[in-house]
Amino acid sequence: MHPDLGPLCTLLYVTLTILCSSVSSDLAPYFTSEPLSAVQKLGGPVVLHCSAQPVTTRISWLHNGKTLDGNLEHVKIHQGTLTILSLNSSLLGYYQCLANNSIGAIVSGPATVSVAVLGDFGSSTKHVITAEEKSAGFIGCRVPESNPKAEVRYKIRGKWLEHSTENYLILPSGNLQILNVSLEDKGSYKCAAYNPVTHQLKVEPIGRKLLVSRPSSDDVHILHPTHSQALAVLSRSPVTLECVVSGVPAPQVYWLKDGQDIAPGSNWRRLYSHLATDSVDPADSGNYSCMAGNKSGDVKYVTYMVNVLEHASISKGLQDQIVSLGATVHFTCDVHGNPAPNCTWFHNAQPIHPSARHLTAGNGLKISGVTVEDVGMYQCVADNGIGFMHSTGRLEIENDGGFKPVIITAPVSAKVADGDFVTLSCNASGLPVPVIRWYDSHGLITSHPSQVLRSKSRKSQLSRPEGLNLEPVYFVLSQAGASSLHIQAVTQEHAGKYICEAANEHGTTQAEASLMVVPFETNTKAETVTLPDAAQNDDRSKRDGSETGLLSSFPVKVHPSAVESAPEKNASGISVPDAPIILSPPQTHTPDTYNLVWRAGKDGGLPINAYFVKYRKLDDGVGMLGSWHTVRVPGSENELHLAELEPSSLYEVLMVARSAAGEGQPAMLTFRTSKEKTASSKNTQASSPPVGIPKYPVVSEAANNNFGVVLTDSSRHSGVPEAPDRPTISTASETSVYVTWIPRANGGSPITAFKVEYKRMRTSNWLVAAEDIPPSKLSVEVRSLEPGSTYKFRVIAINHYGESFRSSASRPYQVVGFPNRFSSRPITGPHIAYTEAVSDTQIMLKWTYIPSSNNNTPIQGFYIYYRPTDSDNDSDYKRDVVEGSKQWHMIGHLQPETSYDIKMQCFNEGGESEFSNVMICETKVKRVPGASEYPVKDLSTPPNSLGSGGNVGPATSPARSSDMLYLIVGCVLGVMVLILMVFIAMCLWKNRQQNTIQKYDPPGYLYQGSDMNGQMVDYTTLSGASQINGNVHGGFLTNGGLSSGYSHLHHKVPNAVNGIVNGSLNGGLYSGHSNSLTRTHVDFEHPHHLVNGGGMYTAVPQIDPLECVNCRNCRNNNRCFTKTNSTFSSSPPPVVPVVAPYPQDGLEMKPLSHVKVPVCLTSAVPDCGQLPEESVKDNVEPVPTQRTCCQDIVNDVSSDGSEDPAEFSRGQEGMINLRIPDHLQLAKSCVWEGDSCAHSETEINIVSWNALILPPVPEGCAEKTMWSPPGIPLDSPTEVLQQPRET
């Protein structure tokens, strides 16, 4: 059985912690990196870095030898980083980093912060230069003063030369050498200087003109330098000794050092006629001569006196010394350098002033009568203006019983704003190591590192429940010989004096500092601001005790004894629990509930008794804060159901774990509820479970709608906070903005600070705008922004584990106004790429502008000029002004159908550029009122356009808006739907009418009159209809309601009769039914079938063969039908009024005069077939003698009877009745053609009728042969079918 190793591990951990703390406390501070000098333009940011060891070392900063106040405007200090947000003249100078711990303090070398400048070119005295062809040419340039060194460029014949080429060599001095002059090199040359920090480019106002001449002689000339030069160069830097020599042929050039040839293999090398080295050494100092000669023995030379400068160095530094009290100490520091460096002595980062006990002689320091105050760190700093070097040494006193404490670094008084984060530091040394305590106006400050400072107002004390003894707790971090007092959110109650006391067994020492707290509105620190008044009042009320921070409302009782014994608990391995780890996502799918799920952090050695959860609503739209709601959850639970929340709202949650050791660090979360659902769905929601019922913490993977937040894995916890929401930007002043954000989950550790970064558009670097922003502030003011520039901002949250991810960058924000760094006018103008007339009074144009064409010179905007093309007067030009960020413009108030000239310029404070290309565009023709309006081409607005009045932007565009487009589409669709509805209604009405017709007059049904034994048909030709008084014998439809002049009988007739027009013999076609059609038309599928007028078709009943002789009256219209499934019936034949089809098989129809003829039906009818020729010669052609074909027809019918025999029956009084069923498959017809009988057989699906040509009847025979069926008076009107006249 293994023994319990828990106590052993705890004891080992505590021992190692004590040893490490002791070792760290005995280590002297030293720098691992020191700040470097920087050059920046005014208004630009500067960042200095410094780091030191051991980890207990604290870093502060000095400016020009004085302690730098971290609350200065435009200055931010965070650990070892110093950030100057906006450089101004008061912040120029040298900066030093100061590192201190319990052993002592040391100071770094100075880092100079200077402003970048670029001077102006001086006047040039020589404007025309002559160079010989095939020789060397030299263009001198007096480079203006610049910090840092300017880059030299040349503009040669209008083209820029930035780097050396094969024929052009830009020398380090800024001069230009032409290696081999030719005639092509003549022209103008201008020198320019470019500052890489300010990005300024200055060109000399008057350049030089190069003339190329023929070689005149073989003389040798040294064009540069013209006289000897003294040159001081820095050790280990590149050097070029220039020597430009001309002559034809090219002279020989060689170099001497101190009168001797330069040995080959040295650091020097030849560069054309120059002498160069990449790294010069101190041994390279001396005199260098450039010798040039030709074949004729002409020699010329020039001399350089080179002095190599060396950085300050220390060959022998300080040594640590341990002496007894009252002894004498000597420190020696051997320094070297060119020029000779000066040596400065420091004790604990403070300059040592000569005194009776402190003497400086040469490079040594002598201290007489050492006392306790002399212990600490000593420094020797060597500086010769080229560089610096320092050496440190420690002075200790022998351990002969120890000595009283000495405060090495005292706390510094500060003036801060309400709500700021304040840190007071104090370091002391002594033997044994002293214990440091803090006091305020109320006495000793007792605290625990895990607790935060809270208000001490009597109101808050009285508002607490009885028995709750909650002492004000400060956040104090103490180590051996060092202590820091932190106040996370300072208030007016914290103002006053604070005393740092260091004590050991030999005595005590004190140092004090004053803390002044001012309201934020009068704060001189301009970078940090509070939220709106509502948020400030809320924070102040919390500080007053109604809702005092996170822990003030928790039922916590902190006894002084527990606070005093806190270090012992830490020593025994017991501490307060860590912050809970929240697993819930930052959003919920329900509008009024949220499940908060977490898991416990480290319990600190004691079980967690309870969790305290506080939540409130955040109105992220206006920055309003709701009131806190506090819930206590048993320590065994890991889930809390929050109910009665507001939909679509942002909530903030703070929770801590409590054990017997106290409350741990708070965990923070922000979540958003979903949108409100419908009333029906909301009523069906399950009721909220009671608080305290444990649940399994399950996070649905389907929750993908996280509002842009990246969820961390719930199975692990990174510790760093989540990225804040995207910040919002609002205007504070002309050159400053407010950056406001909303934090999210703190990752299990409280957020200690925020950091805001900014980026100027068209640059790639993010810079720090503000850091060390207290967590109580969710807004910051960023100042000194450049007018006219566009910026983006992002926010970072910081806690004990580190920095969060960067938030999403804000939307671009453009600072109003124009930059103040315009130095010259732009040269090249924009290019108009496109013009279009969008209406009769407006023209739209687009252009492109390339900043690099003007050396990236900023512009303020564009001038757009336009005038009618037919005008030659420049005063007719009108001008529109457009912002520099625009890429298109709409010119308005133009004349219709007029051509315009359009040109542009870009401008800034320096002036206007050259004109762009000229475009000609003509406006459209003015529309006539009431004319159709054609849609105008849609104009897309560029993303960066910000319509700002005038005719710029989409507000004045003539293109249809989306609302007008929707209106047009809606109207078109409405008209289409209306047309469709009318069409459907017409189809339904027509279908209903057809159904009505088919109901009474089925197409394939032949009506059989029960009382009909025969029929009379009046046949009227179209041409003869008017011969009988313009009238017909009776009406066609209803009681003569259709006059003879009505000639359109309209109905569908497919090649034959397809329907029967209803009616009765007594005013209609058949009795018992009235006509429902006021106008009945007959349509023909083949309109050309109506030939030579119309005709009447009728069903001809088949007669017995014995009576075929009486069929002669039928002439050519005898027709034999075979009807399948027919039966004999006594019913009379049907009456069928039809229209003549197109003549087929030789059948021809002839128009007849209006006559009344009998239909040959029985043998009892007298023979009226022989008619006088003169009676019919005007109407009908003579009919040849016929012989009956009825027998053949009957035989044909009988022969086909096996297949589908037709049945015939003889009716009463000799009537032959033919009954035709609904489906007729075969019809056989026989017609006379001359003396022969032609048979035709046609297979159809409906009854087929042929024209019945009736012969004329004499007047005497007409009345005798008139037949009337029983029950019908003879004076009844006869039904007549009048055919349409064909045109």
Curated annotation (Swiss-Prot):
Substitution effect: T684S: In HPE11; benign
InterPro entries, per database record: FN3_dom, FN3_sf, Ig-like_dom, Ig-like_dom_sf, Ig-like_fold, Ig_I-set, Ig_sub, Ig_sub2
GO CC annotations on file: plasma membrane
Disulfide bonds: C50-C97, C141-C191, C243-C290, C333-C380, C426-C500
Main subcellular location: membrane
Domain Fibronectin type-III: 579-677, 723-821, 826-926
Alphabetized Gene3D superfamilies for the sequence: Immunoglobulins (2.60.40.10)
PTM info: N-glycosylated.
Record's keyword annotation contains Zinc: no
Start and end residues of each stretch annotated as Disordered: 531-553, 933-955, 1268-1287
GO biological process: anterior/posterior pattern specification; cell adhesion; cell fate specification; cell-cell adhesion; central nervous system neuron differentiation; cerebral cortex development; embryonic body morphogenesis; embryonic retina morphogenesis in camera-type eye
Residue ranges annotated as Extracellular topological domain: 26-963
Topology versus the membrane: Single-pass membrane protein
The entry's keywords: Cell membrane, Disease variant, Disulfide bond, Glycoprotein, Holoprosencephaly, Immunoglobulin domain, Membrane, Repeat, Signal, Transmembrane, Transmembrane helix
Record-annotated Ig-like C2-type domain positions: 29-114, 120-204, 225-303, 310-396, 405-516
The protein's name: Cell adhesion molecule-related/down-regulated by oncogenes
